[in-house]
């Protein structure tokens, strides 16, 4: 049964981009900045509406809204507001570009985005990436990664996952057996087998394969991945399995570990909260509450501070 996706941010009723542009200008003009007005306004408008405000701001004041926001705000709060202002169709592509740019590769970002986006979303990301950066996402990924990790990313980026159709029980059995043979029953691991099955079979088929695998082997597929692989490949295969089981649950877990323990991974916190605010953040909140002994709202509240915290809590949209 398909889950109905629900975001926390929707179009603001009675939206007036000129009035909003004036409110923002007033909040930034003269001495000091009225951060409260900025964050309240921007978190309650959809991304499409924020783009309209930006255009109205340019028309009314001859100024670039994003530049003004950047010069008035600082730190994590600035990063969050800048992320909210990015056109949503560009946001994932932008994050991937930055993960690949310069010295070192941010595998965490590559893994999270590429594993948790649907084939349709991945196709759109590839298109936007090429338009924006003049190079192919796939080529850039190949140039910056290696081994089976690279291979799995490329297979996912092909976005050729089978569409969900009727379940073929014989094929389910065959794939589950093949995974068992490729891992637990083999000296060493046949990574290619995992990559092909995880990267090309339909979501509903794979859910059945994971159940069947448990029956055949006595292990959850995650335990096998943990034992049979390591490093970036292990992280990616686990992210794919978790996303196949439930994207909101995978992203809830991603948020949880971004905040758990000492220090906060603010980059991840901002990326997930912003990129999912209009897609499935309500679903993520529900999974968070179900799987961890607290709510997303309380965890953000305890883990962040100041205007940054206020803005994140407004995006979160409530306690569960």
From Swiss-Prot:
N6-acetyllysine modification sites are: 70, 76, 79, 97, 101
Residues in a coiled coil are none
In the record, N6-succinyllysine modifications are located at 290
Q: Which InterPro entries match?
A: Annexin (IPR001464), Annexin_repeat (IPR018502), Annexin_repeat_CS (IPR018252), Annexin_sf (IPR037104), ANX5 (IPR002392)
Give residues where Phosphoserine occurs: 37
Give the UniProt keywords, A-Z.
Acetylation, Annexin, Blood coagulation, Calcium, Calcium/phospholipid-binding, Hemostasis, Isopeptide bond, Phosphoprotein, Repeat, S-nitrosylation, Ubl conjugation
Q: Where is this cross-link: Glycyl lysine isopeptide (Lys-Gly) (interchain with G-Cter in SUMO1)?
A: 29
User: What ranges cover the Annexin repeats?
Assistant: 15-86, 87-158, 170-242, 246-317
Residue numbers bearing the N-acetylalanine modification: 2
Cross-link entry Glycyl lysine isopeptide (Lys-Gly) (interchain with G-Cter in SUMO2), positions: 29
Task: Fill in the PTM field for this protein.
Answer: S-nitrosylation is induced by interferon-gamma and oxidatively-modified low-densitity lipoprotein (LDL(ox)) possibly implicating the iNOS-S100A8/9 transnitrosylase complex.
> Where would I look for the motif [IL]-x-C-x-x-[DE] motif in this sequence?
314-320
Record GO biological process: blood coagulation; negative regulation of coagulation
Q: Which Pfam families match?
A: Annexin (PF00191)
The UniProt entry's GO CC annotations, sorted and at most eight, read: cytoplasm; nucleus; plasma membrane; vesicle membrane
Q: Give this protein's Gene Ontology molecular function annotations.
A: calcium ion binding; calcium-dependent phospholipid binding; phosphatidylserine binding
Q: Tell me yes or no: is Transcription regulation among this UniProt entry's keywords.
A: no
Q: Give the UniProt family note.
A: Belongs to the annexin family.
> What is the recorded function of this protein according to its Swiss-Prot or TrEMBL entry?
This protein is an anticoagulant protein that acts as an indirect inhibitor of the thromboplastin-specific complex, which is involved in the blood coagulation cascade.
Q: How does it assemble?
A: Monomer. Binds ATRX and EIF5B.
Relay the domain remarks: A pair of annexin repeats may form one binding site for calcium and phospholipid.
This one is known as Annexin A5
Organism of origin is Macaca fascicularis (Crab-eating macaque)
């Amino acid at each position: 049964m398909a889950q109905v996706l629900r975001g926390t941010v929707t179009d603001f009723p009675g939206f007036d981009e000129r009035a909003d542009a004036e409110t923002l200008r007033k909040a930034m003009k003269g001495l000091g900045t009225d951060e409260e007005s900025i964050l309240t306004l921007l978190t309650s408008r959809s991304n499409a509406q924020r783009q309209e405000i930006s255009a109205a701001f340019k028309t009314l004041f001859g100024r670039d809204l994003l530049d003004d926001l950047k010069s008035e705000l600082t730190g994590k709060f600035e990063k969050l507001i800048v992320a909210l202002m990015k056109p949503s169709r560009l946001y994932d592509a932008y994050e991937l570009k930055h993960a690949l740019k310069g010295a070192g590769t941010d595998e965490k970002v590559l893994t999270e985005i590429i594993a948790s986006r649907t084939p349709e979303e991945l196709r759109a990301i590839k298109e936007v990436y090429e338009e924006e950066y003049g190079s192919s996402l796939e080529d850039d990924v190949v140039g910056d990664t290696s081994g089976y990790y690279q291979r799995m990313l490329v297979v996912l980026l092909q976005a050729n996952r089978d569409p969900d159709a009727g379940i073929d029980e014989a094929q389910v059995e065959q794939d589950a057996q093949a995974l068992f043979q490729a891992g637990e029953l083999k000296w060493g691991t046949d990574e290619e087998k995992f990559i092909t099955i995880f990267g090309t079979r339909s979501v509903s088929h794979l859910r059945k394969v994971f159940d069947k695998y448990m029956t055949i082997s006595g292990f959850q597929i995650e335990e096998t991945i943990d034992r049979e692989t390591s490093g970036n490949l292990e992280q990616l295969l686990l992210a794919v399995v978790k996303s196949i089981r439930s994207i909101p649950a995978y992203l809830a877990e991603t948020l949880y570990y971004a905040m758990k323990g000492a220090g906060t991974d603010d980059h991840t916190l901002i990326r997930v909260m912003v990129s999912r605010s209009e897609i499935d953040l309500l679903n993520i909140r529900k999974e968070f509450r179900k799987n961890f002994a607290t709510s997303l709202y309380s965890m953000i509240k305890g883990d962040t501070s100041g205007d940054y915290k206020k803005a994140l809590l407004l995006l979160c949209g409530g306690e569960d």
